[in-house]
UniProtKB/Swiss-Prot annotation:
SMART domains: AdoHcyase, AdoHcyase_NAD
Catalytic activity from the UniProt record: S-adenosyl-L-homocysteine + H2O = L-homocysteine + adenosine
Family: Belongs to the adenosylhomocysteinase family.
Record text on cofactor binding: Binds 1 NAD(+) per subunit.
Listed HAMAP family: AdoHcyase
GO cellular component, one term: cytosol
NCBIfam families on file: ahcY, PRK05476.2-3
Binding positions for substrate per the UniProt entry: 67, 144, 204, 234, 238
GO biological process entries: L-homocysteine biosynthetic process; one-carbon metabolic process; S-adenosylmethionine cycle
Binding residues annotated for NAD(+), in chain numbering: 205-207, 239, 268-273, 291, 326, 347-349, 392
EC number of the protein: 3.13.2.1
Species of the source: Nitrosomonas eutropha (strain DSM 101675 / C91 / Nm57)
Protein name: Adenosylhomocysteinase
Gene: ahcY
Length: 478
């Protein structure tokens, strides 16, 4: 896709981007302006730090859903002194007007809604292509799901041992491995050179964090990482309250289905599953939960949900939502047994939770973008949303701005910390200190009209606390 600048900015031409339509930039800019009023954390960081430029010299390779809210994050990073190159971390999650607005500010972005897998991995390479002669390269990664980090690490391993990309296990790996092989031929040593320049990564989501901890455990983590996901002001807000609003938004935009009276199955009762269950119950659905963890299963039961297995539920429920981060949670056999017109969707990061590959052999009927009928030989149909990828971003616009402000404020603080103090960190996975977590929360209270009670000196002494926090021990679970 070619890119020519819309005359919104200086009538100049900016070609270091791949977006759907730069004429959408004005629309994107108007929505960004609205989002900024709902993102007090990011705006406070701009006000506090823009004059100090704490990210000056940072060249951030960003791989995160290219939404309106992400545009506010990108422009905050730039305001704090960083250079940025950006791609989306999902082929369906880009909001094209958001990407256009960022490109119109001469910020390199490579993303459009409905990318092919080949384009997705091409764009993942592009965020590391700082200069054609290699004189500058990315020195920080901001990741969501871990694909940008994976690309450099796997590519570097393949430089030493090509057999690591010899046997793909699925379609996505086929495309990724082919992309790496092509780069190994055209640019020998490209991956290891880029990897060597990275100071650290900040990771947004549960799935990507899991990858980082696995690498740390094996001694394969090449640089320090900050686990943004497990900041309380991310996981207990974005994952819970964000999904509570965006799941139903995606299902309703896609299908116009009446939720009330339906049986809905949520696979997984972590923070994401809890938010999904609340939203569906709030609209009148009977909600069932599947779980492997006895603690989460007990929580679900104590909240009044029925805890079942997919084998029990697959032929009875009307709506199925996966929220586990696992693979093949909904199998071919489960889908064969589902009711006619059952709705099947996923809100976990990757598309592995529903075994979509196993039903590709049947007839597919596209209803509209990201909404498909799978027609079985019996004539029964199920409705698959976003091809098993993130339903809230594929079929809607993701989480609301306010809750993303909380998550993204953590991201900016994590980038600042690693950029300024990365040499003090070992090649391990870290979380931000609780004092910063509480600061992020404080930045968002005023928007909601919240007034905090302040401890008296006597009370603080009694509790053995600093009056200004932190207020809870590290192990406190909220």
């Amino acid at each position: 896709m070619s890119a020519t600048i819309n005359p919104v900015v200086d009538n100049s031409v900016f070609t270091d981007c791949e977006v759907a339509d730069l004429s959408l930039a004005d629309w994107g800019r108007k929505e960004i302006a609205i989002a900024e009023t709902e993102m007090p954390g990011l705006m406070a960081l701009r006000e506090q730090y823009a004059g100090k430029k704490p990210l000056a010299g940072a060249r951030i390779a960003g791989s995160l859903h290219m939404t309106i809210q992400t545009a506010v994050l990108i422009e905050t990073l730039v305001a704090l002194g960083a250079e940025v190159r950006w791609a989306s971390c999902n082929i369906f999650s880009t909001q094209d007007h958001a990407a256009a607005a960022i490109a119109a500010r001469d910020i390199p972005v490579f993303a459009y809604k409905g990318e092919s897998l080949k384009e997705y991995w091409d764009y993942a390479h592009q965020i590391f292509e700082w200069t054609s002669d290699g004189s500058h390269a990315a020195n920080m990664i901001l990741d969501d799901g871990g694909d940008a980090t994976l690309l450099l690490i796997l590519g570097s391993r393949a430089e030493r041992d090509p057999s690591v990309i010899a046997n793909p296990s699925n379609e996505e790996e086929q495309v990724l491995f082919a992309s790496i092989r092509s780069r190994l031929t055209s640019h020998p040593g490209w991956y290891s050179r880029n990897l060597a320049g990275i100071r650290g990564v900040t990771e947004e989501t549960t799935t990507g964090v899991h990858r980082l901890y696995e690498m740390e455990k094996k001694g394969e983590l090449p640089f320090p990482a900050i686990n943004v996901n497990d900041s309380v002001t991310k996981s207990k807000f974005d994952n819970l309250y964000g999904c509570r609003e965006s799941l139903v938004d995606g299902i309703k935009r896609a299908t116009d289905v009446m939720i009330a009276g339906k049986i809905a199955v949520i696979c997984g009762y972590g923070d994401v599953g809890k938010g999904c269950a609340q939203s569906l119950r709030g609209l009148g659905a009977t909600v069932w939960i599947t779980e492997i963890d006895p603690i989460c299963a007990l929580q679900a039961a104590m909240e009044g949900y029925r805890v079942v297995t997919m084998d029990d539920a697959c032929d009875k429920a009307d709506i199925f939502v996966t929220a586990t981060g696992n693979l093949r949670v909904i199998t071919h056999d489960h889908m064969l047994k589902m009711k006619n017109q059952a709705i099947v969707c996923n809100i976990g990061h990757f598309d592995s939770e529903i075994d979509i590959a196993s039903v590709q052999k049947y007839q597919w009927e596209n209803i509209k973008p990201q909404v498909d009928h799978v027609i079985f030989p019996t004539g029964r149909r199920i409705i698959v949303l976003a091809q098993g990828r993130l339903v809230n971003l594929g079929c809607a616009t993701g989480h609301p701005s306010f809750v993303m402000s909380s998550s993204f404020t953590n991201q900016v603080l994590a980038q600042m910390e690693l950029w300024q103090n990365g040499k003090d960190y070992q090649k391990k996975v870290y979380v931000l200190p609780k004092q910063l977590d509480e600061m992020v929360a404080r930045l968002h209270l005023g928007k909601l009209g919240v007034k905090l009670t302040e401890l008296t000196d006597e009370q603080a002494h009694y509790l053995n606390l600093d009056k200004n926090g932190p207020y809870k021990p590290e192990m406190y679970r909220y």
